[in-house]
């Protein structure tokens, strides 16, 4: 994912990115702004990052693989629930499909 006019590149696994793209684009189509936050992988660095997602901020979804991953509806719903909460969108573990 590439965020903002400075082109900050954020490495996100293709499967997670596909789910995040659906949630983020749904909210942006509704002209909603929200916080997107995640904890860093310990192999990368300790800590966390938070981004303000707003329709006026450039956002580009870039995938490594050539195929779009299949979507897990339960995961999409869990991510959307998080995005609609006061704490904003946070990466949650993928649940089993119903």
List each model region and its residues.
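Short, extreme N-terminal segment that most often corresponds to the first beta-strand
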Residues: 1-13
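Alpha-helix boundary/capping detector
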Residues: 2, 46, 50, 74-77
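N-terminal intrinsically disordered, cationic/polar leader segments
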Residues: 12, 19-22
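Helix N-cap / beta->alpha transition motif
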Residues: 13, 50-54, 72
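Short, intrinsically disordered, mixed-charge
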Residues: 22-30
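Short glycine-rich, low-complexity/disordered patches
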Residues: 30-40, 89-98
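Short, structured protein-protein interaction patches enriched in aromatics and acidic/basic residues
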Residues: 32-64
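Mixed-charge, glycine-accented linear interaction segment located at domain edges/termini
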Residues: 66-98
